[in-house]
Structures are given as structure tokens and as C-alpha cells.
Curated annotation (Swiss-Prot):
It comes from Chlorokybus atmophyticus. It is found in: Plastid, Chloroplast. GO terms for biological process: translation. The keyword Cytoplasm does not apply. GO terms for molecular function: structural constituent of ribosome. Its main location: plastid. Belongs to the bacterial ribosomal protein bL33 family. Keywords: Chloroplast, Plastid, Ribonucleoprotein, Ribosomal protein. This is Large ribosomal subunit protein bL33c. HAMAP family: Ribosomal_bL33. GO terms for cellular component: chloroplast; ribonucleoprotein complex; ribosome. PROSITE patterns: RIBOSOMAL_L33 (PS00582). It holds the Pfam family Ribosomal_L33.
Amino acid sequence: MAKNKGTRITITLECTNCKSNDLKRSPGVSRYTTQKNRRNTPNRLELKKFCSRCNQHTLHKEIK
């Protein structure tokens, strides 16, 4: 029998500061991958994480 998909999905978090900031250490955008539980957090995830491109802790938002 086939198993159901489950509640945990893999998501990508992207730095919001890298998109708008022109004065950064290196080109590109900082991204993290993590898992979230669909039932506990149905809306988009936002976490403060370290961005190696900006060299500081910034807000990372979930992207599709």
C-alpha cells in the first residue's frame, strides 16, 4: 500500500536583505533549506538567520 505524503515538507528560506542591498560582500542570495510541519505552521515561515553574503543576521522568508 502507498504511504501518504505526511505533514513535514522541505522548504527554502531566502534572505530578504540581499535582494534590495547593492553594497554586499559577494554577489548572489543567501538560502537555507529546512523542514516544517504543515499542520503546526500553515502560513509562510520567517526566521532570523545569519547571511554570509551580508555578513549579519537578517530576516529569511520562505519561498516557493
